[in-house]
């Protein structure tokens, strides 16, 4: 474990976790996340960002270096379905683009409490359908996301299958929240070890998102779904000391049970979605290197081009 990670773990436990445990003002939480992103997240040199609409949904496209515009990663940002945005995660999109040679599309999906389930999933589907209508080959489209966005990526895999849409080339998920029944053993086992996420707030966040929907619904809790045979290959990264450790393990097991190729990668001392600190934290850069190689492999070979 690097010295910088040790220091970050200390600060998160002393400052961030107590704040998240007591904060109730959604607008204030959003502002705090936005400020943290501006202060702490590093944008790769030469990163390019372009806003537009895709399937009626506002998106931000991130790219860096030489990319092939036919290769696309749709990345769903995390934030418990109530905060976060393409802006808070655009640096991550650019960093992934640099590593896999694809452009990264970050949808501005609707958030709670203004818009409950299934609004986020509807927006995710709209983006994917728009790419398919535009002639993009699903063999060159990947889904990805972190935390709540990671769970949303797997929900979209299930939703696409149910609607007769083709599966994506692969899925990459960082610390995904995949079981909203809140029955994962690690929620309690790692409650004290997790330096950032307070277990005591998850039920409130979950209930606001569901607004009465059944947490057992596979589109809500993909870790409880029966995936169709031969699901897309998946790379799942998580921490051994975060409360969502078992959410990551469970979705991986479900995919493997359906015959899917799954790469599970666990870090021993990292915090929830440490990958956001790319450029500052060597453990984040190592994780993104692994994710980029996985995406490059499964998105297929094409001829890259500038911008």
What do these predicted regions represent?
Residues 1-67, 300-307:
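A glycine/proline-hinged amphipathic helix-loop "lid/cap" segment
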Residues 50-307:
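Alpha/beta-hydrolase superfamily serine-hydrolase fold, recognizing
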């Amino acid at each position: 474990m690097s010295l910088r990670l040790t220091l970050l773990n200390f600060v998160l436990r002393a400052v961030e976790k107590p704040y998240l445990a007591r904060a109730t003002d959604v607008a204030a939480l959003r502002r705090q996340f936005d400020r943290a992103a501006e202060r702490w997240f590093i944008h790769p040199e030469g990163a390019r960002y372009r806003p537009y609409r895709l399937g009626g949904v506002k998106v931000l496209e991130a790219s860096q270096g030489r990319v092939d515009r036919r290769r696309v990663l749709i990345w769903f940002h995390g934030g418990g379905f109530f905060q976060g945005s393409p802006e808070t995660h655009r640096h991550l999109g650019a960093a992934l683009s640099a590593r896999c040679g694809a452009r990264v599309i970050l949808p501005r999906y609707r958030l709670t409490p203004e818009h409950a389930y299934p609004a986020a999933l509807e927006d995710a589907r709209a983006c994917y359908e728009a790419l398919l209508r535009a002639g993009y080959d699903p063999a060159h489209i990947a889904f990805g996301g972190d935390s709540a966005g990671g769970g949303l990526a797997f929900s979209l895999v299930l939703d696409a299958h149910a609607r007769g849409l083709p599966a994506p080339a692969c899925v990459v998920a960082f610390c995904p929240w995949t079981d909203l029944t809140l029955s994962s053993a690690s929620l309690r086992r790692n409650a004290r070890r997790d330096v950032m996420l307070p277990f005591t707030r998850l039920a409130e966040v979950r209930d606001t998102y569901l607004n009465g929907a059944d947490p057992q619904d596979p589109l809500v809790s993909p870790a409880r779904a029966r995936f169709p045979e031969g699901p897309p290959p998946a790379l799942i990264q998580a921490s051994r000391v975060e409360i969502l450790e078992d959410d990551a393990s469970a979705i991986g097991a479900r995919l493997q049970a359906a015959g899917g190729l799954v790469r599970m990668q666990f870090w021993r001392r990292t915090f929830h979605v440490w990958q956001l600190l790319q450029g500052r934290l060597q453990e984040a850069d190592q994780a993104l290197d692994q994710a980029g190689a996985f995406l490059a492999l499964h998105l297929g070979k094409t001829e890259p081009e500038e911008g």
